[in-house]
Amino acid sequence: MASSLCASSAIAAISSPSFLGGKKLRLKKKLTVPAVSRPDASVRAVAADPDRPIWFPGSTPPEWLDGSLPGDFGFDPLGLSSDPDSLKWNVQAEIVHCRWAMLGAAGIFIPEFLTKIGILNTPSWYTAGEQEYFTDKTTLFVVELILIGWAEGRRWADIIKPGSVNTDPVFPNNKLTGTDVGYPGGLWFDPLGWGSGSPAKLKELRTKEIKNGRLAMLAVMGAWFQHIYTGTGPIDNLFAHLADPGHATIFAAFTPK
């Protein structure tokens, strides 16, 4: 399962108060659904806090965002998650995007930094696809498509029917029990057993994951735009700014030379 942080409160969990006339009344009926249709049952056991942090102080969060979901700061100005099924999907979509973004951010910043200080010698993340590897790009793409497709297919099946993929396809005796959708746990995904704590502690850890994931999504997007306008990576830009903070700034990219 690129959270949303300095930015965490700004991009908090996808969900929203509807400010379009008539929409709110129409959606109230849709909210009368059993609680089991909402994801992360074990986390939702924590009662909603009326004094919980809100993305904008003084604002009223929508009914479908009661604070029981990790990373929920009552932000959904377009009502994208007003429908229970949409909320369920958006929760899982955000989790997986957060995790990919965190991996992506690590893949951008760490190799570039280690190359900058002379420990590694790797190409820029922006041009990594142009390099020659142990086989051709078509083979790499097909293998990646098969592996990722298999993993995403099982994730999709778990969303549709929670618990349906808890049995190891290779070793049927290995089974997971009591896991929430998007949080498989077990030896591979929770080797330290952090997911076995109290509901309050579990929600705290999941909220931290969402926040870091949202920050990572912003960081990856920032690195992308930065390379478009400067032609260099974030670490190179950082070192250049530290060496000449008066001139090496974001504004220099838009200044005619």
From Swiss-Prot:
<dbReference type="GO" id="GO:0005829">
    <property type="term" value="C:cytosol"/>
</dbReference>
<dbReference type="GO" id="GO:0009645">
    <property type="term" value="P:response to low light intensity stimulus"/>
</dbReference>
<feature type="binding site">
    <location>
        <position position="214"/>
    </location>
    <ligand>
        <name>chlorophyll a 1</name>
    </ligand>
</feature>
<dbReference type="GO" id="GO:0009579">
    <property type="term" value="C:thylakoid"/>
</dbReference>
<feature type="binding site">
    <location>
        <position position="155"/>
    </location>
    <ligand>
        <name>chlorophyll b 4</name>
    </ligand>
</feature>
<keyword id="KW-0602">Photosynthesis</keyword>
<keyword id="KW-0148">Chlorophyll</keyword>
<dbReference type="GO" id="GO:0009522">
    <property type="term" value="C:photosystem I"/>
</dbReference>
<dbReference type="GO" id="GO:0009768">
    <property type="term" value="P:photosynthesis, light harvesting in photosystem I"/>
</dbReference>
<dbReference type="GO" id="GO:0009535">
    <property type="term" value="C:chloroplast thylakoid membrane"/>
</dbReference>
<feature type="binding site" description="axial binding residue">
    <location>
        <position position="94"/>
    </location>
    <ligand>
        <name>chlorophyll a 1</name>
    </ligand>
</feature>
<keyword id="KW-0934">Plastid</keyword>
<keyword id="KW-0479">Metal-binding</keyword>
<feature type="binding site">
    <location>
        <position position="99"/>
    </location>
    <ligand>
        <name>chlorophyll b 2</name>
    </ligand>
</feature>
<keyword id="KW-0472">Membrane</keyword>
<dbReference type="GO" id="GO:0016168">
    <property type="term" value="F:chlorophyll binding"/>
</dbReference>
<protein>
    <recommendedName>
        <fullName>Photosystem I chlorophyll a/b-binding protein 2, chloroplastic</fullName>
    </recommendedName>
</protein>
<keyword id="KW-0157">Chromophore</keyword>
<feature type="binding site" description="axial binding residue">
    <location>
        <position position="152"/>
    </location>
    <ligand>
        <name>chlorophyll b 3</name>
    </ligand>
</feature>
<feature type="binding site">
    <location>
        <position position="75"/>
    </location>
    <ligand>
        <name>chlorophyll a 1</name>
    </ligand>
</feature>
<dbReference type="Pfam" id="PF00504">
    <property type="entry name" value="Chloroa_b-bind"/>
</dbReference>
<keyword id="KW-0809">Transit peptide</keyword>
<feature type="transit peptide" description="Chloroplast">
    <location>
        <begin position="1"/>
        <end position="43"/>
    </location>
</feature>
<keyword id="KW-1133">Transmembrane helix</keyword>
<keyword id="KW-0603">Photosystem I</keyword>
<dbReference type="GO" id="GO:0019904">
    <property type="term" value="F:protein domain specific binding"/>
</dbReference>
<comment type="subunit">
    <text>The LHC complex consists of chlorophyll a-b binding proteins. Red-emitting heterodimers with LHCA3 and LHCA5. Binds to carotenoids.</text>
</comment>
<feature type="binding site" description="axial binding residue">
    <location>
        <position position="226"/>
    </location>
    <ligand>
        <name>chlorophyll a 5</name>
    </ligand>
</feature>
<dbReference type="GO" id="GO:0009534">
    <property type="term" value="C:chloroplast thylakoid"/>
</dbReference>
<dbReference type="GO" id="GO:0009409">
    <property type="term" value="P:response to cold"/>
</dbReference>
<dbReference type="InterPro" id="IPR001344">
    <property type="entry name" value="Chloro_AB-bd_pln"/>
</dbReference>
<feature type="binding site" description="axial binding residue">
    <location>
        <position position="55"/>
    </location>
    <ligand>
        <name>chlorophyll b 1</name>
    </ligand>
</feature>
<comment type="similarity">
    <text>Belongs to the light-harvesting chlorophyll a/b-binding (LHC) protein family.</text>
</comment>
<keyword id="KW-0460">Magnesium</keyword>
<feature type="binding site" description="axial binding residue">
    <location>
        <position position="241"/>
    </location>
    <ligand>
        <name>chlorophyll a 6</name>
    </ligand>
</feature>
<keyword id="KW-0793">Thylakoid</keyword>
<feature type="binding site" description="axial binding residue">
    <location>
        <position position="212"/>
    </location>
    <ligand>
        <name>chlorophyll a 4</name>
    </ligand>
</feature>
<keyword id="KW-0150">Chloroplast</keyword>
<dbReference type="InterPro" id="IPR022796">
    <property type="entry name" value="Chloroa_b-bind"/>
</dbReference>
<feature type="transmembrane region" description="Helical">
    <location>
        <begin position="215"/>
        <end position="235"/>
    </location>
</feature>
<feature type="binding site">
    <location>
        <position position="208"/>
    </location>
    <ligand>
        <name>chlorophyll a 5</name>
    </ligand>
</feature>
<feature type="binding site" description="axial binding residue">
    <location>
        <position position="209"/>
    </location>
    <ligand>
        <name>chlorophyll a 3</name>
    </ligand>
</feature>
